[in-house]
């Protein structure tokens, strides 16, 4: 189903608790990063990702620590909208490819799972595309790092490090908190291979990554 009109009203999010603000915000961040490096990326989705990423960087912490700051809520609402437009047209990647099975197997908030997985998937993808000589995707990860950190000369890995720090600051619970153990990893990996989101990942990932 597709709506004729979508009304995005940031004022409706002012009462959202900090923990839900954090996890939904991290989901929005993942939905901006994954389409930007997706195998199905395109210029129009690039543009909306470039609009949304710096807004998350500027506003998510504030929206969590000062929930009534309307300008932060406005920025996050726009970033979330941009992520929705991007994923609908360019797909996602391994973060959401893993998050779907994990959410189905355990009682875990989707945004929390995405936030925990995001930096590790970014690091794995960066290493994989570097090994494959995919300079364009590597350049895109470096651009993500610039958009998130505000620093002009940064490595692709700096974006993943920035996300990891953010997730820690927002006190997102680890996957173990929902009951997942190392023994469950093989089942998650097997199910993730059937996830449509995996088709958008910029490169195949080995099972042991």
Specify the residue positions occupied by each region the protein language model found.
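Short, amphipathic C-terminal "tail helix"
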Residues: 181-209
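Acidic-glycine-rich active-site phosphate/pyrophosphate-binding loop
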Residues: 1-6, 26-27, 53, 57, ...
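Glycine-rich phosphate/pyrophosphate-binding beta-alpha loops
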Residues: 81-114, 195-199
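Short alpha-helical scaffolding segments that buttress acidic/His motifs in well-ordered protein cores
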Residues: 29-33, 76-84, 118-122, 163, ...
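A glycine/threonine-rich phosphate-anchoring loop and its flanking beta-alpha core
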Residues: 1-41, 135-143
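Gly/Pro-rich interdomain helix-loop hinge
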Residues: 105-183
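Glycine-rich phosphate/diphosphate-binding loops and the adjacent beta-loop-alpha structural elements
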Residues: 35-89, 100-103
């Amino acid at each position: 189903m597709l709506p004729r009109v979508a009304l995005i009203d940031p004022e409706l999010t002012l009462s959202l608790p900090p923990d839900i603000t954090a996890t939904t915000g991290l989901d929005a961040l993942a939905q901006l990063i994954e389409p930007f490096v997706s195998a199905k990326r395109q210029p129009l989705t690039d543009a909306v990702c470039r609009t949304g990423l710096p807004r998350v960087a500027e506003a998510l912490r504030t929206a969590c620590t000062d929930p009534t700051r309307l300008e932060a809520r406005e920025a996050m609402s726009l970033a979330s909208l941009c992520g929705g437009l991007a994923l609908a047209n360019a797909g996602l990647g391994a973060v959401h490819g893993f998050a779907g099975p994990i959410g189905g197997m355990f009682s875990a908030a989707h945004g929390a799972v995405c936030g925990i997985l995001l930096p590790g998937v970014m690091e794995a993808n960066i290493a994989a595309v570097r090994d494959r000589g995919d300079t364009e995707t590597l350049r895109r990860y470096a651009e993500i790092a610039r958009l998130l950190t505000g620093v002009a000369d940064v490595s692709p890995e700096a974006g993943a490090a920035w996300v990891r720090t953010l997730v820690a600051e927002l006190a997102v619970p680890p996957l173990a908190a929902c009951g997942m153990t190392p023994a469950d990893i093989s089942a998650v990996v097997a199910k993730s291979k059937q996830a449509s989101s995996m088709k958008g990942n910029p490169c195949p990932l080995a099972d042991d990554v």
